[in-house]
Amino acid sequence: QLGPQVPAHLRTDLSKKQGPWAEEEAAYGWMDF
């Protein structure tokens, strides 16, 4: 859903979080870089 913009290592982090907020967090998190 987030698309290819999200780095693979961030996607792996999402799997570890396993929370309903994980997707949104990643969407904003990768922009922090």
From Swiss-Prot:
One MF annotation (Gene Ontology) recorded for this entry: hormone activity
Record PTM Phenylalanine amide, positions in chain: F33
Coiled coil spans: none
Record's keyword annotation contains Secreted: yes
Chief place of localization: secreted
Domain of life: Eukaryota
Subcellular location: Secreted
Signal peptide region: none
Cysteine pairings via disulfide bonds: none
Alphabetized InterPro entries for the sequence: GAST, Gastrin/cholecystokinin_CS
Gene Ontology, cellular component aspect: extracellular space
Tagged with keyword Secreted: yes
Record keywords, A-Z: Amidation, Cleavage on pair of basic residues, Hormone, Pyrrolidone carboxylic acid, Secreted
Pyrrolidone carboxylic acid: residues bearing it: Q1
One biological process term in Gene Ontology: G protein-coupled receptor signaling pathway
Function statement: Gastrin stimulates the stomach mucosa to produce and secrete hydrochloric acid and the pancreas to secrete its digestive enzymes. It also stimulates smooth muscle contraction and increases blood circulation and water secretion in the stomach and intestine.
Entry similarity comment: Belongs to the gastrin/cholecystokinin family.
Protein name in UniProt: Gastrin
Organism: Cavia porcellus
Gene field: GAST
